[in-house]
């Protein structure tokens, strides 16, 4: 039996656009879609065609021009949404409808005003209606993590019989715990009688900061598709961050034993593009793509990394397309890191000069919140002037 592969479904352009303050225009969406295809995602959820004319045109443009990847469009379980999605995806190389209806009792009572039987009937009818209009049909049970498990199994079983190829299990409000969500995925796999050959998808929100953990738990328990967004953008607290899920799978291949189609060297470029087009800056300590993700300030850590990067790095910045800027020099930095930085700047100092320059650096670092490259050059040039009687002005060869 071959190595199992996880399908990467990117919803940056649909769920990601639901981030408060984010509004992609059609050109933005197309640019991101091209980059997602270059990144190697399997499915791009391009938008919600029935939501607006602008979203319809954006989805249509992506379907018309972006090839080599499945293009998905979302719609409610109503004929008008399904028809609109079908029209938008007409020229897609491979099309997918992502149709949804809520299944939790709280949604049925307060939002849909429907009974369980009515929801089940509507779900089955709309999947049957969509059959033949798309290459694939994905059915989502909205608020699955708060739905009665046996009812969820019944819904999934009947929509599969109706023609669904993928069943999605959304933790819509980020309520589930990792073990609990994994157990739900396993329960579905073990109790839906016609599940063989059907893709089980995980879609997790980050309201409790657990979207990535829940996604990985789902994969561990049998989910074969994971739904993610670049930089974790999305409704409220966001979605599972693509870069974190993928690099967890990469870094712990020994644990998960799975492969995917992502070209990880495009992760940083993709993250940067989405950050620029959304206007959402990444926090410096953001995992994988934050400015500090591969930087070390402690002298002990810096010394370890100089000797062998594996001492304090579990992945290489080059693996995600980042040019290393390994050391953040500051008051906690040690002499080894300082000396390496001085050499990288092109200076060739004697041991005595290094000692004096390092003393000046530590004194400055105690007084200055942020040390930049020009600060290093200043203390080195000042030291050279004191020892040699002149400022070098340029790096020594």
Swiss-Prot record:
GO CC list: cytoplasm
Cofactor: Mn(2+)
Domain Pyruvate carboxyltransferase as annotated: residue spans: 6-268
Alphabetically ordered keywords of this record: Amino-acid biosynthesis, Branched-chain amino acid biosynthesis, Cytoplasm, Leucine biosynthesis, Manganese, Metal-binding, Transferase
EC number: 2.3.3.13
Locations listed in the record: Cytoplasm
Pfam families associated with the record: HCS_D2, HMGL-like
Pathway: Amino-acid biosynthesis; L-leucine biosynthesis; L-leucine from 3-methyl-2-oxobutanoate: step 1/4
Assembly description: Homodimer.
Family affiliation: Belongs to the alpha-IPM synthase/homocitrate synthase family. LeuA type 1 subfamily.
Protein name as annotated: 2-isopropylmalate synthase 1
Source organism (scientific name): Caldanaerobacter subterraneus subsp. tengcongensis (strain DSM 15242 / JCM 11007 / NBRC 100824 / MB4)
């Amino acid at each position: 039996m071959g190595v199992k592969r996880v399908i990467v479904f990117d919803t940056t352009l649909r769920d990601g656009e639901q981030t408060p303050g984010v509004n992609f225009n059609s050109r933005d969406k197309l640019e991101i879609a091209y980059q997602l295809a270059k990144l190697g995602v399997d499915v791009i959820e391009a938008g919600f065609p029935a939501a607006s004319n602008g979203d319809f045109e954006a989805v249509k443009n992506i379907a018309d021009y972006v090839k080599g990847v499945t293009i998905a469009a979302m719609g409610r379980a109503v004929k008008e949404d399904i028809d609109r999605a079908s029209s938008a995806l007409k020229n897609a190389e491979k099309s997918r409808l992502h149709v949804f209806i809520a299944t939790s009792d709280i949604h049925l009572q307060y939002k849909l005003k429907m009974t369980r039987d009515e929801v089940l009937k509507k779900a089955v009818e709309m999947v049957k209606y969509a059959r033949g209009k798309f290459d694939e049909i994905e059915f989502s049970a909205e608020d699955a993590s708060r739905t009665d498990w046996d009812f969820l199994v019944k819904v999934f079983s009947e929509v599969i019989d109706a023609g669904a190829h993928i069943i999605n299990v959304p933790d819509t409000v980020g309520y589930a715990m990792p073990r609990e969500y994994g157990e739900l995925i396993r329960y579905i796999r073990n109790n839906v009688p016609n599940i063989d050959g059907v893709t089980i998808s995980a879609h997790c929100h980050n309201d409790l900061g657990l979207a990535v953990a829940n996604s990985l738990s789902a994969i561990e328990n049998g989910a074969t598709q994971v739904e993610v967004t670049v930089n974790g953008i999305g409704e409220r607290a966001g979605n599972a961050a693509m870069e974190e899920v993928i690099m967890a799978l990469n870094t712990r291949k020994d644990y998960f034993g799975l492969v995917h189609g992502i070209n990880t060297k495009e992760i940083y470029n993709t993250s940067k593009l989405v950050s620029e087009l959304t206007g959402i800056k990444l926090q410096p300590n953001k995992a994988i793509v934050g400015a500090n993700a591969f930087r070390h300030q402690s002298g002990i850590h810096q010394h370890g990394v100089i000797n062998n990067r594996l001492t304090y790095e579990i992945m290489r910045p080059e693996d995600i397309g980042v040019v290393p800027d390994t050391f953040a020099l500051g008051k906690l930095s040690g002499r080894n890191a300082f000396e390496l930085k001085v050499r990288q700047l092109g200076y060739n100092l004697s041991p005595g000069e290094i000692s004096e320059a390092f003393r000046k650096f530590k004194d400055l670092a105690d007084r200055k919140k942020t040390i930049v490259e020009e600060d290093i050059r200043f203390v080195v040039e000042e030291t050279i002037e004191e020892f040699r009687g002149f400022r070098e002005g340029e790096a020594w060869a």
